[in-house]
Amino acid sequence: MPEIKRLPESVANQISAGEVVERPASVVKELVENSLDAGSNKILIEIENGGKDLIRVKDNGHGIPSDEIEIAFDRYATSKITDINDLYSLKSLGFRGEALASIASVSILDIISRTKSQTKAIKMRLKGGKVISKEPCGASVGTDIIVKDLFFNTPARYKYLKTTRNEFKHISNIITREALAYPGVNFTLIHNGRIVLKTPGTGKTLDCIYAIYGKEMAQSLVKIDYEDRYIKVSGYISRPDYYRYNRSYEIFFVNKRAVHNSILNRGVEEAYQGLLPPGAYPVVFLNLKLNPILVDVNVHPTKKEVKFSRDKVIKEVIQNGINIELSKLDKSPRLKRNINPLNRDDKTKDKSEYQKIKLPEDKEQITNKSSDAGILKNQNPLDSQDSILLPSKKNGFYSKKNSQVSQNKFMDINNKLEKTEINDNYKKDKHYKTDSINIKDNSIKENKNKMDIPIKRVLGQIKNTYIIAEGRDGLYIIDQHNAHERILYQSFIEKYNNSEIVSQPLVVPVNIETTAPEAEVLKSYLPQLEKMGFKLEVFGINSFIVREVPSLIKKRSNKRVVREVIDKLLEHDKAMKPSELINEIISYMSCRGAIKAGEYLDKKEAEQIIEGLFKTDNPYRCPHGRPIIIHITEDDINKGMGRK
């Protein structure tokens, strides 16, 4: 049996450091929090190669006395608590006394620190946790820590670090949250010699949001200041017409500490329930101020997760506070458009995807109900009314200006559709699975053996949403949005693989503001975006100018679509392969570009939809897997009528 031995201090420190120092961002977080606890109002963070080569944090805080600087690197040495009861009234960000010791044990660390009462600073170097040198030097009041060669003595841990871009993203997220929690502190983040984030330190949260996320977001927020019982909720929340398609913009602080807790997300999302499209999330920056005894920050090694003793009450307070602020916006046109995007007749519609992405109608469509509201002219550049593309035999797509066809009936039957038997493939559509397309390998190719069209003639529409058609064996109900989405999707995939996507220049270029990590991701995808029809140019530190977009995107939704495409890139950047991600974006754009529920089609347009649908590789499911066609057989009709 192996003999039980006490581990050497250096080994114990390296093992313990694994809980505190997971990656470069962990180092940045601990050092910045020490700077904040030291009363700093100016903090410089300098990073090289995502923090793998160098991390520097310099502040103007109160500094460390020269006779305490070595003790500061002993494990469990801290100035923030003295006994266990202090944990229940904790006001500092750090308290365990593990951070400096853990960081020093897995790196080469230099520290220069000076207090106000000292005439000279003290400079000390540590390697693997051991003091190598210590000497006086000249420096201003505050602390300057430089960490080099992180994990130099633990190569197994270094091997698991991600790419420079990924590691920098984590660092930027840390600094973003600390800056939002402390708007009175001037933060500067430099990566590879370039300033990527800088906050003004004015003490105003909205100024900080503007500096990090840009003007558009800052102007789309409303202030919240609510107190109930022992909890105060303050910060900013988004109007219902401004949202994102992931939760990464729901940012919470408890007593100015950035935290994660699902109860906070639920409180926010329940307050916005019914106000946002399906799959959309609000943008919130909320700080909860409550008695420290009601929150346990010691449940996670990195202190990013917390536990509440009154979680249900906290959720209710958040929800009530947001509800009150949103209710004040009831008379705002921006809010009304989001709460009631559909006409009165649309209330009974299925809660399907096309409602989520319904766009504002043109004035002509609203005022002239007898006109064709669906097919508009496609022009270049995008300075005309919105366009909807439909298939034609000649060139794959055609566009048409509003016609004067009455909605009460279709035009005379145009016998363009073939009267054929139902294809066996249709009978097997229940076994169909959602497309899995390898874009890089051009797996979508033209269907040489065109499917027979199992439909004789178009009869009409139901609620301007479903095409009703007669076939050789009963009735066919076709979802016009899903059908058009399938047509656009296959055309887009084929054109993408052949680099044939048509772009249209914007009369007024769209400015997109991003955070520093978003900018890094976006730059890496610029070639793929250009191939998809988006022409973006870097414009400033973390902003881009969109000069061209794919022709199928409607003019009035340009900025929204581009923003949502970027959100999808950021959300799935690491979760999907590049080909899968591009496929996801093309599916999304096809959905946004397709005819919507509630749009009137004349008979010819409905026929064109059906004809184009059966030229695709799979006319029975849209790219997201939703059904396109419902078949009611003649036998089913006869049975329902009591004839069988």
UniProtKB/Swiss-Prot annotation:
Chain positions covered by the region annotation Disordered: 336-356
Q: Which domain of life is it from?
A: Bacteria
Q: Does the keyword Transcription apply?
A: no
GO BP terms, alphabetized? mismatch repair
GO MF annotations, alphabetized: ATP binding; ATP hydrolysis activity; ATP-dependent DNA damage sensor activity; mismatched DNA binding
* General function of this protein: This protein is involved in the repair of mismatches in DNA. It is required for dam-dependent methyl-directed DNA mismatch repair. May act as a 'molecular matchmaker', a protein that promotes the formation of a stable complex between two or more DNA-binding proteins in an ATP-dependent manner without itself being part of a final effector complex.
Output this protein's name: DNA mismatch repair protein MutL
UniProt source species:
Halothermothrix orenii (strain H 168 / OCM 544 / DSM 9562)
Provide the gene name from the record: mutL
